[in-house]
Protein backbone atom coordinates (compact mmCIF):
# COMPACT_ATOMS: atom_id res chain seq x y z
CA UNK A 1 0.00 0.00 0.00
CA UNK A 2 1.33 3.44 -0.92
CA UNK A 3 1.97 5.86 1.93
CA UNK A 4 -0.03 9.07 2.02
CA UNK A 5 2.04 11.28 4.32
CA UNK A 6 5.39 9.59 5.00
CA UNK A 7 8.16 10.06 2.47
CA UNK A 8 11.53 8.33 2.32
CA UNK A 9 12.66 10.18 5.45
CA UNK A 10 9.58 10.93 7.52
CA UNK A 11 7.17 13.80 6.92
CA UNK A 12 8.73 16.93 5.45
CA UNK A 13 7.72 20.17 3.74
CA UNK A 14 7.45 23.94 3.91
CA UNK A 15 6.37 25.28 7.28
CA UNK A 16 2.79 26.54 7.19
CA UNK A 17 1.97 24.40 4.16
CA UNK A 18 0.36 20.99 4.58
CA UNK A 19 1.54 18.74 6.14
CA UNK A 20 3.94 20.90 8.21
CA UNK A 21 1.20 22.74 10.09
CA UNK A 22 0.47 22.74 13.84
CA UNK A 23 -2.91 21.04 13.42
CA UNK A 24 -1.54 18.21 11.27
CA UNK A 25 1.50 17.66 13.51
CA UNK A 26 -0.84 17.51 16.52
CA UNK A 27 -2.78 14.74 14.77
CA UNK A 28 0.46 13.03 13.75
CA UNK A 29 1.66 12.96 17.36
CA UNK A 30 -1.70 11.68 18.56
CA UNK A 31 -1.83 8.94 15.90
CA UNK A 32 1.76 7.85 16.64
CA UNK A 33 0.91 7.86 20.34
CA UNK A 34 -2.09 5.61 19.77
CA UNK A 35 0.07 3.13 17.87
CA UNK A 36 2.67 3.16 20.67
CA UNK A 37 0.00 2.50 23.31
CA UNK A 38 -1.34 -0.42 21.29
CA UNK A 39 2.14 -1.92 20.90
CA UNK A 40 3.21 -1.34 24.53
CA UNK A 41 0.33 -2.58 26.67
CA UNK A 42 2.40 -3.39 29.77
CA UNK A 43 3.29 0.19 30.68
CA UNK A 44 2.79 3.79 29.58
CA UNK A 45 5.12 4.40 26.60
CA UNK A 46 7.73 7.15 26.68
CA UNK A 47 8.94 8.97 23.58
CA UNK A 48 11.99 11.23 23.22
CA UNK A 49 11.72 14.41 21.14
CA UNK A 50 14.74 16.29 19.79
CA UNK A 51 14.98 19.09 17.27
CA UNK A 52 17.37 21.23 15.28
CA UNK A 53 17.60 25.02 15.50
CA UNK A 54 14.82 26.16 13.12
CA UNK A 55 12.46 28.79 14.51
CA UNK A 56 9.50 26.54 13.66
CA UNK A 57 10.83 23.83 15.95
CA UNK A 58 9.22 25.45 18.98
CA UNK A 59 5.78 25.37 17.36
CA UNK A 60 6.05 21.83 16.04
CA UNK A 61 7.51 20.49 19.28
CA UNK A 62 4.56 21.89 21.23
CA UNK A 63 2.11 20.31 18.78
CA UNK A 64 3.83 16.91 19.01
CA UNK A 65 3.94 17.03 22.80
CA UNK A 66 0.22 17.82 22.93
CA UNK A 67 -0.59 14.96 20.56
CA UNK A 68 1.51 12.36 22.36
CA UNK A 69 0.35 13.29 25.86
CA UNK A 70 -3.30 13.37 24.73
CA UNK A 71 -2.84 9.76 23.57
CA UNK A 72 -1.43 8.74 26.96
CA UNK A 73 2.28 8.80 26.09
CA UNK A 74 4.98 10.35 28.27
CA UNK A 75 7.40 12.72 26.52
CA UNK A 76 11.06 13.52 27.22
CA UNK A 77 12.39 16.64 25.45
CA UNK A 78 16.09 17.19 24.75
CA UNK A 79 16.14 20.55 22.98
CA UNK A 80 18.56 20.92 20.04
CA UNK A 81 20.36 17.63 19.39
CA UNK A 82 21.61 15.93 16.21
CA UNK A 83 19.37 13.32 14.65
CA UNK A 84 21.82 10.48 15.44
CA UNK A 85 21.86 11.72 19.05
CA UNK A 86 18.10 11.22 19.22
CA UNK A 87 18.52 7.71 17.81
CA UNK A 88 21.25 6.93 20.36
CA UNK A 89 19.33 8.24 23.38
CA UNK A 90 16.18 6.41 22.33
CA UNK A 91 18.21 3.21 22.52
CA UNK A 92 20.31 4.10 25.58
CA UNK A 93 17.34 5.19 27.69
CA UNK A 94 15.27 2.15 26.62
CA UNK A 95 12.46 4.38 25.35
CA UNK A 96 9.51 3.33 23.22
CA UNK A 97 10.31 5.71 20.35
CA UNK A 98 12.21 8.82 19.33
CA UNK A 99 11.22 11.78 17.19
CA UNK A 100 13.45 14.32 15.46
CA UNK A 101 12.07 17.65 14.28
CA UNK A 102 14.27 18.67 11.36
CA UNK A 103 14.44 19.15 7.60
CA UNK A 104 18.12 18.16 7.55
CA UNK A 105 20.03 20.15 4.91
CA UNK A 106 17.02 22.21 3.75
CA UNK A 107 16.52 25.93 4.39
CA UNK A 108 15.02 27.19 7.67
CA UNK A 109 11.62 27.65 5.99
CA UNK A 110 11.21 23.86 5.75
CA UNK A 111 10.84 21.39 8.57
CA UNK A 112 10.01 17.75 9.09
CA UNK A 113 9.23 14.96 11.53
CA UNK A 114 11.34 11.80 11.58
CA UNK A 115 10.50 8.81 13.81
CA UNK A 116 12.71 6.17 15.40
CA UNK A 117 11.38 2.92 16.81
CA UNK A 118 12.49 1.26 20.03
CA UNK A 119 16.24 0.70 19.84
CA UNK A 120 16.77 3.87 17.81
CA UNK A 121 16.11 2.27 14.43
CA UNK A 122 14.02 3.84 11.68
CA UNK A 123 10.34 2.96 11.64
CA UNK A 124 9.26 0.12 9.40
CA UNK A 125 6.91 0.77 6.50
CA UNK A 126 4.28 -1.27 8.34
CA UNK A 127 4.31 0.99 11.41
CA UNK A 128 4.26 4.12 9.26
CA UNK A 129 1.13 2.77 7.56
CA UNK A 130 -0.41 2.06 10.98
CA UNK A 131 0.16 5.69 11.98
CA UNK A 132 -1.23 6.98 8.70
CA UNK A 133 -4.39 4.92 9.16
CA UNK A 134 -5.10 6.79 12.40
CA UNK A 135 -4.16 10.35 11.40
CA UNK A 136 -7.49 11.18 9.82
CA UNK A 137 -9.49 9.64 12.67
CA UNK A 138 -11.20 11.53 15.45
CA UNK A 139 -9.07 12.76 18.36
CA UNK A 140 -10.48 11.70 21.71
CA UNK A 141 -8.53 13.02 24.67
CA UNK A 142 -8.14 10.47 27.44
CA UNK A 143 -9.37 11.01 31.00
CA UNK A 144 -6.92 13.12 33.00
CA UNK A 145 -5.66 10.14 34.99
CA UNK A 146 -4.44 8.48 31.77
CA UNK A 147 -2.79 11.48 30.09
CA UNK A 148 0.94 11.50 29.49
CA UNK A 149 3.48 13.79 31.15
CA UNK A 150 6.14 15.93 29.46
CA UNK A 151 9.52 16.90 30.90
CA UNK A 152 12.86 18.22 29.72
CA UNK A 153 15.82 15.93 30.25
CA UNK A 154 19.09 17.36 31.53
CA UNK A 155 22.42 16.07 30.33
CA UNK A 156 21.27 14.80 26.92
CA UNK A 157 24.17 16.63 25.25
CA UNK A 158 26.72 15.17 27.65
CA UNK A 159 25.44 11.61 27.19
CA UNK A 160 25.69 11.92 23.42
CA UNK A 161 29.14 13.53 23.58
CA UNK A 162 30.46 10.63 25.66
CA UNK A 163 28.92 8.14 23.26
CA UNK A 164 30.61 9.80 20.27
CA UNK A 165 33.97 9.82 22.06
CA UNK A 166 33.58 6.12 22.90
CA UNK A 167 33.68 5.27 19.17
CA UNK A 168 37.24 6.62 18.86
CA UNK A 169 40.08 4.20 19.74
CA UNK A 170 40.69 4.34 23.49
CA UNK A 171 44.46 4.12 23.04
CA UNK A 172 44.56 7.24 20.87
CA UNK A 173 43.59 10.93 20.83
CA UNK A 174 43.55 13.98 18.56
CA UNK A 175 46.36 15.96 20.19
CA UNK A 176 48.43 17.85 17.66
CA UNK A 177 45.56 18.33 15.22
CA UNK A 178 43.96 21.69 14.47
CA UNK A 179 40.39 21.29 13.24
CA UNK A 180 37.78 23.72 11.97
CA UNK A 181 34.28 22.46 12.80
CA UNK A 182 31.32 23.84 10.83
CA UNK A 183 28.02 22.80 12.41
CA UNK A 184 25.80 24.61 9.86
CA UNK A 185 24.17 26.69 12.61
CA UNK A 186 22.29 23.49 13.25
CA UNK A 187 21.62 20.76 15.77
CA UNK A 188 25.29 19.90 16.32
CA UNK A 189 26.44 23.36 17.37
CA UNK A 190 26.45 22.54 21.08
CA UNK A 191 28.03 19.09 20.91
CA UNK A 192 30.35 18.64 17.91
CA UNK A 193 33.10 21.11 18.92
CA UNK A 194 33.18 19.59 22.43
CA UNK A 195 33.65 16.05 21.12
CA UNK A 196 36.80 16.94 19.17
CA UNK A 197 38.10 19.31 21.85
CA UNK A 198 37.73 16.71 24.61
CA UNK A 199 39.68 14.23 22.48
CA UNK A 200 42.58 16.68 22.41
CA UNK A 201 42.20 18.62 19.16
CA UNK A 202 42.61 22.36 18.88
CA UNK A 203 39.17 23.41 17.64
CA UNK A 204 38.00 26.45 15.71
CA UNK A 205 34.19 26.58 15.57
CA UNK A 206 32.21 28.19 12.76
CA UNK A 207 28.54 27.95 11.87
CA UNK A 208 27.87 27.74 15.60
CA UNK A 209 25.62 30.75 16.18
CA UNK A 210 22.09 29.62 15.30
CA UNK A 211 19.34 32.25 15.42
CA UNK A 212 16.44 30.19 14.11
CA UNK A 213 16.83 31.42 10.56
CA UNK A 214 20.43 30.74 9.50
CA UNK A 215 20.58 26.93 9.56
CA UNK A 216 22.46 25.68 6.46
CA UNK A 217 22.78 29.26 5.19
CA UNK A 218 26.12 29.45 3.33
CA UNK A 219 27.60 26.96 5.77
CA UNK A 220 27.71 23.27 6.59
CA UNK A 221 28.03 20.14 4.48
CA UNK A 222 26.00 21.49 1.57
CA UNK A 223 28.04 24.72 1.28
CA UNK A 224 31.71 24.07 1.98
CA UNK A 225 33.18 27.34 0.66
CA UNK A 226 33.00 28.93 4.11
CA UNK A 227 34.78 25.97 5.68
CA UNK A 228 37.43 25.87 2.95
CA UNK A 229 38.26 29.53 3.54
CA UNK A 230 38.38 29.04 7.31
CA UNK A 231 40.74 26.05 7.04
CA UNK A 232 43.16 28.11 4.96
CA UNK A 233 42.79 31.19 7.18
CA UNK A 234 43.49 29.28 10.41
CA UNK A 235 46.10 26.97 8.81
CA UNK A 236 44.17 23.99 10.13
CA UNK A 237 44.90 20.35 9.39
CA UNK A 238 41.31 19.50 8.48
CA UNK A 239 37.86 20.97 8.27
CA UNK A 240 34.75 19.05 9.28
CA UNK A 241 31.32 20.09 8.01
CA UNK A 242 28.00 18.74 9.26
CA UNK A 243 24.56 19.50 7.89
CA UNK A 244 21.64 20.99 9.82
CA UNK A 245 20.71 17.82 11.70
CA UNK A 246 24.21 16.39 12.02
CA UNK A 247 23.89 13.19 10.02
CA UNK A 248 26.00 14.23 6.99
CA UNK A 249 29.74 14.81 6.75
CA UNK A 250 32.09 16.55 4.34
CA UNK A 251 35.78 17.12 5.08
CA UNK A 252 38.39 19.58 3.84
CA UNK A 253 42.17 19.09 3.90
CA UNK A 254 44.82 21.68 4.75
CA UNK A 255 44.93 22.83 1.13
CA UNK A 256 41.20 23.53 1.03
CA UNK A 257 40.25 20.49 -1.05
CA UNK A 258 36.82 18.99 -0.33
CA UNK A 259 36.31 15.25 0.22
CA UNK A 260 32.80 13.86 -0.19
CA UNK A 261 31.16 10.80 1.29
CA UNK A 262 32.60 8.41 -1.30
CA UNK A 263 36.18 9.46 -0.51
CA UNK A 264 35.65 9.28 3.25
CA UNK A 265 34.03 5.85 3.04
CA UNK A 266 37.05 4.63 1.09
CA UNK A 267 39.43 5.91 3.79
CA UNK A 268 37.50 4.12 6.54
CA UNK A 269 37.21 0.87 4.57
CA UNK A 270 40.89 0.83 3.59
CA UNK A 271 41.99 1.28 7.21
CA UNK A 272 39.65 -1.47 8.44
CA UNK A 273 41.03 -3.80 5.77
CA UNK A 274 44.61 -2.88 6.77
CA UNK A 275 43.76 -3.75 10.40
CA UNK A 276 42.32 -7.10 9.34
CA UNK A 277 38.83 -6.17 10.50
CA UNK A 278 36.15 -8.06 8.59
CA UNK A 279 33.64 -5.43 7.50
CA UNK A 280 31.99 -7.81 5.03
CA UNK A 281 31.92 -5.14 2.36
CA UNK A 282 30.82 -1.61 1.49
CA UNK A 283 27.35 -0.59 0.32
CA UNK A 284 27.19 2.42 -1.98
CA UNK A 285 24.40 3.59 -4.26
CA UNK A 286 23.73 3.60 -7.98
CA UNK A 287 25.40 7.03 -8.00
CA UNK A 288 28.66 5.92 -6.33
CA UNK A 289 31.59 6.51 -8.67
CA UNK A 290 32.82 3.38 -10.44
CA UNK A 291 36.44 4.29 -9.71
CA UNK A 292 35.74 3.94 -6.00
CA UNK A 293 34.23 0.48 -6.54
CA UNK A 294 37.38 -0.60 -8.41
CA UNK A 295 39.68 0.90 -5.74
CA UNK A 296 37.82 -0.92 -2.96
CA UNK A 297 38.08 -4.23 -4.76
CA UNK A 298 41.82 -3.67 -5.17
CA UNK A 299 41.92 -3.48 -1.35
CA UNK A 300 40.05 -6.79 -1.15
CA UNK A 301 36.78 -5.13 -0.10
CA UNK A 302 33.51 -6.27 -1.67
CA UNK A 303 31.07 -3.65 -2.93
CA UNK A 304 27.40 -3.50 -3.86
CA UNK A 305 24.95 -0.76 -4.84
CA UNK A 306 21.62 0.22 -3.30
CA UNK A 307 19.04 2.73 -4.47
CA UNK A 308 19.76 6.37 -3.64
CA UNK A 309 18.83 7.14 -0.03
CA UNK A 310 20.42 6.22 3.28
CA UNK A 311 17.47 4.01 4.28
CA UNK A 312 18.18 1.78 1.25
CA UNK A 313 21.89 1.66 2.07
CA UNK A 314 20.99 0.69 5.64
CA UNK A 315 18.64 -2.04 4.41
CA UNK A 316 21.42 -3.57 2.29
CA UNK A 317 23.91 -3.39 5.17
CA UNK A 318 21.47 -5.18 7.46
CA UNK A 319 20.58 -7.76 4.83
CA UNK A 320 24.23 -8.59 4.12
CA UNK A 321 25.54 -8.05 7.69
CA UNK A 322 28.13 -5.61 6.31
CA UNK A 323 29.49 -2.74 8.36
CA UNK A 324 30.29 0.25 6.11
CA UNK A 325 28.15 2.14 3.62
CA UNK A 326 26.92 5.51 2.49
CA UNK A 327 26.54 8.10 -0.22
CA UNK A 328 28.61 10.83 -1.82
CA UNK A 329 26.25 13.34 -0.17
CA UNK A 330 27.92 12.56 3.15
CA UNK A 331 25.57 10.04 4.72
CA UNK A 332 28.02 7.48 6.11
CA UNK A 333 27.07 4.41 8.12
CA UNK A 334 29.54 2.61 10.37
CA UNK A 335 27.33 -0.14 11.76
CA UNK A 336 29.86 -1.29 14.34
CA UNK A 337 29.71 2.20 15.90
CA UNK A 338 26.09 3.39 15.46
CA UNK A 339 22.93 2.12 13.80
CA UNK A 340 22.32 5.30 11.81
CA UNK A 341 24.34 7.86 9.86
CA UNK A 342 26.25 10.19 12.19
CA UNK A 343 28.43 13.05 10.95
CA UNK A 344 30.46 13.39 14.15
CA UNK A 345 31.13 9.67 14.50
CA UNK A 346 31.96 9.36 10.81
CA UNK A 347 34.54 12.15 11.15
CA UNK A 348 36.08 10.37 14.12
CA UNK A 349 36.33 7.15 12.09
CA UNK A 350 38.08 9.01 9.26
CA UNK A 351 40.57 10.59 11.67
CA UNK A 352 41.19 7.21 13.35
CA UNK A 353 41.68 5.61 9.92
CA UNK A 354 44.28 8.22 8.96
CA UNK A 355 46.17 7.40 12.15
CA UNK A 356 46.02 3.69 11.32
CA UNK A 357 47.29 4.28 7.80
CA UNK A 358 49.81 6.91 8.99
CA UNK A 359 48.89 9.09 6.01
CA UNK A 360 46.99 12.29 5.43
CA UNK A 361 43.66 12.53 3.65
CA UNK A 362 45.09 13.64 0.32
CA UNK A 363 47.58 10.77 0.20
CA UNK A 364 45.01 8.06 0.95
CA UNK A 365 42.49 9.44 -1.52
CA UNK A 366 45.15 9.64 -4.24
CA UNK A 367 44.60 5.87 -4.60
CA UNK A 368 41.76 6.65 -6.99
CA UNK A 369 40.45 9.49 -9.09
CA UNK A 370 36.72 9.72 -9.79
CA UNK A 371 35.73 8.83 -13.33
CA UNK A 372 34.39 11.84 -15.24
CA UNK A 373 30.60 12.01 -15.27
CA UNK A 374 28.15 13.66 -17.62
CA UNK A 375 24.62 14.27 -16.33
CA UNK A 376 21.76 15.45 -18.55
CA UNK A 377 18.18 16.09 -17.44
CA UNK A 378 15.67 15.29 -20.20
CA UNK A 379 12.14 16.62 -19.84
CA UNK A 380 9.43 14.12 -20.79
CA UNK A 381 5.68 14.16 -21.28
CA UNK A 382 3.33 12.34 -18.94
CA UNK A 383 3.00 8.75 -20.07
CA UNK A 384 5.94 8.99 -22.46
CA UNK A 385 7.53 5.57 -23.03
CA UNK A 386 11.09 6.79 -22.68
CA UNK A 387 12.46 3.37 -21.73
CA UNK A 388 11.36 1.95 -25.08
CA UNK A 389 12.71 4.94 -26.99
CA UNK A 390 16.18 4.67 -25.45
CA UNK A 391 16.48 0.88 -25.29
CA UNK A 392 18.64 0.32 -28.38
CA UNK A 393 20.98 3.28 -27.84
CA UNK A 394 21.32 2.38 -24.15
CA UNK A 395 22.39 -1.15 -25.07
CA UNK A 396 24.96 0.22 -27.54
CA UNK A 397 26.49 2.62 -25.00
CA UNK A 398 26.60 0.00 -22.24
CA UNK A 399 28.38 -2.43 -24.58
CA UNK A 400 30.93 0.23 -25.56
CA UNK A 401 31.61 1.10 -21.91
CA UNK A 402 31.74 -2.45 -20.56
CA UNK A 403 34.46 -2.52 -17.90
CA UNK A 404 35.29 1.13 -18.61
CA UNK A 405 32.18 2.96 -17.43
CA UNK A 406 28.49 2.69 -16.71
CA UNK A 407 25.10 4.28 -17.31
CA UNK A 408 22.39 5.23 -14.80
CA UNK A 409 18.91 6.34 -15.89
CA UNK A 410 16.60 7.66 -13.17
CA UNK A 411 13.13 9.13 -13.49
CA UNK A 412 12.69 12.02 -11.05
CA UNK A 413 10.08 11.49 -8.37
CA UNK A 414 9.21 15.18 -8.18
CA UNK A 415 9.28 16.51 -11.76
CA UNK A 416 8.76 15.22 -15.34
CA UNK A 417 12.44 14.60 -15.92
CA UNK A 418 14.65 11.61 -16.71
CA UNK A 419 18.18 11.98 -15.37
CA UNK A 420 20.83 10.50 -17.64
CA UNK A 421 24.19 9.87 -15.97
CA UNK A 422 27.13 8.35 -17.80
CA UNK A 423 30.57 7.94 -16.25
CA UNK A 424 33.65 6.59 -17.96
CA UNK A 425 37.44 6.57 -17.73
CA UNK A 426 37.58 9.35 -20.29
CA UNK A 427 35.39 12.46 -20.22
CA UNK A 428 34.62 12.36 -23.94
CA UNK A 429 33.28 8.80 -23.65
CA UNK A 430 30.93 9.89 -20.88
CA UNK A 431 29.80 13.00 -22.73
CA UNK A 432 29.20 11.17 -26.01
CA UNK A 433 27.22 8.36 -24.35
CA UNK A 434 25.04 10.71 -22.31
CA UNK A 435 24.24 12.90 -25.31
CA UNK A 436 23.25 9.91 -27.45
CA UNK A 437 20.94 8.48 -24.78
CA UNK A 438 19.42 11.87 -23.97
CA UNK A 439 18.79 12.48 -27.67
CA UNK A 440 16.99 9.14 -27.98
CA UNK A 441 14.77 9.88 -24.98
CA UNK A 442 13.97 13.39 -26.18
CA UNK A 443 13.23 12.34 -29.75
CA UNK A 444 9.62 11.29 -29.06
UniProtKB/Swiss-Prot annotation:
It is an enzyme of class 5 (isomerase). It holds the Pfam family PGM_PMM_II. Its EC number is 5.4.2.10. One of its GO terms (biological process) is peptidoglycan biosynthetic process. GO terms for molecular function: magnesium ion binding; phosphoglucosamine mutase activity; phosphomannomutase activity. Signal peptide: none annotated. The active site is at residue 104. The keyword Transcription does not apply. The modification Phosphoserine is found at residue 104. Keywords: Isomerase, Magnesium, Metal-binding, Phosphoprotein. Activated by phosphorylation. Gene3D superfamilies: Alpha-D-Glucose-1,6-Bisphosphate, subunit A, domain 3 (3.40.120.10), Alpha-D-phosphohexomutase, C-terminal domain (3.30.310.50). One of its GO terms (cellular component) is cytosol. It catalyses: alpha-D-glucosamine 1-phosphate = D-glucosamine 6-phosphate. Its cofactor is Mg(2+). Binds 1 Mg(2+) ion per subunit. Mg(2+) binds at residues 104, 243, 245, 247. CDD domains: GlmM (cd05802). Catalyzes the conversion of glucosamine-6-phosphate to glucosamine-1-phosphate. Belongs to the phosphohexose mutase family. HAMAP family: GlmM_B (MF_01554_B). This is Phosphoglucosamine mutase.
Amino acid sequence: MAKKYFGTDGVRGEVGQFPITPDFVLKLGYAAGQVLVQHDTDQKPTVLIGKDTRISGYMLEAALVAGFTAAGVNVVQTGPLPTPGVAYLTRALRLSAGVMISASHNAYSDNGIKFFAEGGVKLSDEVELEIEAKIDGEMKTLPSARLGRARRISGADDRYIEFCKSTFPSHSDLRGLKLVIDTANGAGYGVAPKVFHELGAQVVSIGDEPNGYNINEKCGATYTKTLQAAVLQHEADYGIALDGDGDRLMMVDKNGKVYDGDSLIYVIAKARAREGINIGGVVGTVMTNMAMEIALKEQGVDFCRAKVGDRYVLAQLNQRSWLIGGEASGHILCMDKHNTGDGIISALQVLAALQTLNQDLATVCADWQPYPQTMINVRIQKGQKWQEASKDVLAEVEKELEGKGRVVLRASGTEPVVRVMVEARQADWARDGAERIASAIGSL
